[in-house]
Amino acid sequence: MTKNSSTVFTHARIATLEEKAANLGLIEEAALVVKDARIVYAGPENKLPGEYASFEKIDCGNRLITPGLIDCHTHLVHAGNRAHEFELRLQGATYEEVARAGGGIVSSVRNLRAASEDDLVRETLPRLDALIAEGVTTVEVKSGYGLDRDSEIKSLKAARRLGEERDVAIRTTFLGAHALPPEMNGDKAAYIDRVINDMLPAIAEQGLADAVDGFCEGIAFLPDEIARVFDAAKAHDIPVKLHADQLSNLHGAALAASYGALSADHLEYTDGDGAAAMASAGTVAVLLPGAYYFIRETQKPPVEAFRAAGTKMALATDNNPGTSPLTSLLLTMNMGATLFRMTVEECIAGVTREAARALGILDQTGTLEIGKDADLAIWDIERPAELVYRIGFNPLWKRVFKGQI
């Protein structure tokens, strides 16, 4: 591991992922220069300024440099697993049937409440390590398995500690409106009161949330209930995002757009109006093919409608114990292509530039541009398409986080 803050990566091919660049912004025979954890040059090697001649050099051997990958939707902090529910679904039970029978999210709540913060960190690190091993440099982590003030705070603190234990950027999201805890006896209005009057103020005061999320679905919370949470988030000046239209069309995409949400996620049942509303609001569509695959969904998100509307699309693992126990963004890209018919360029942009946009950090990372964080992944491949094409193969050569290998 090098601690040199000034490095030139030579003999490289660079996919900058710049916004308007064609073909992933690919530059052949390129060099990239890092100084003080920032990118200071990314371009043709034969135009490399002489001022960098004394910097440490790393010969990339014509390998491909991309931005470090970004997993923009995870529930990485959880306790235990739900393999038994996997077996139930194989026997024919639906996601909704499992949830209504007391399984699903509520079973994860029991496990998380019983775990200590240290337990959560210890159990989560192997999942995080699996992502890091594939070139991931930023991970979004949601709460939502505590569903009371102390447990939600515990989850968010555990998530923040992940960034202290590993060289990775962590973005935390408060997902109090994830499910109704059993002690509320079906009283959703009273629970939303707790979310906005008890949990959110404490979390905001401690600065533990970079965003606020909700689950807008018949088995979770209806649009008017989510709107109350979003109004409270806006009062605390915290951006919002939404689990929307996964199992039915409750017009969650349009709701998210009406609040200027960073993203709306899942979106299998979103219609053309929802796609257009998201495009107008700049709300990113975060597609989660792992969950689609794992629960054997048949309704695909409207990728063509998103393209037609100009809605930006990101991809994420949705790592969670019940519906997407997935810790591979490389496999997620392949699923985005094979299941949702996304292009190679859409898939790679979806785990770099558009994932950064979905987290509100595109000004810091997600592309290889001067002034941005030196978060890089260097791949031993001949074509960018290999990142999407291969299954069960990791061609990562080096991962660079804030300029450090």
UniProtKB/Swiss-Prot annotation:
One GO cellular component, as annotated: cytoplasm
Annotated source species: Brucella suis biovar 1 (strain 1330)
Keyword Ligase: no
Keyword set, alphabetical order: Cytoplasm, Histidine metabolism, Hydrolase, Iron, Metal-binding, Zinc
Compartment(s): Cytoplasm
Residues at which 4-imidazolone-5-propanoate binds: 82, 145, 178, 246, 323
Gene3D superfamilies linked: Metal-dependent hydrolases (3.20.20.140), Urease, subunit C, domain 1 (2.30.40.10)
UniProt binding sites for N-formimidoyl-L-glutamate: 145, 320, 322
Catalytic activity: 4-imidazolone-5-propanoate + H2O = N-formimidoyl-L-glutamate
Cofactor: Zn(2+); Fe(3+)
Binding note for cofactor: Binds 1 zinc or iron ion per subunit.
HAMAP family membership: HutI
GO term, biological process aspect, one: L-histidine catabolic process to glutamate and formamide
Record: residues binding Fe(3+): 73, 75, 243, 318
CDD domains, alphabetized: Imidazolone-5PH (cd01296)
Family listed: Belongs to the metallo-dependent hydrolases superfamily. HutI family.
GO molecular function term, any single one: imidazolonepropionase activity
Role, per record: Catalyzes the hydrolytic cleavage of the carbon-nitrogen bond in imidazolone-5-propanoate to yield N-formimidoyl-L-glutamate. It is the third step in the universal histidine degradation pathway.
Protein name per the record: Imidazolonepropionase
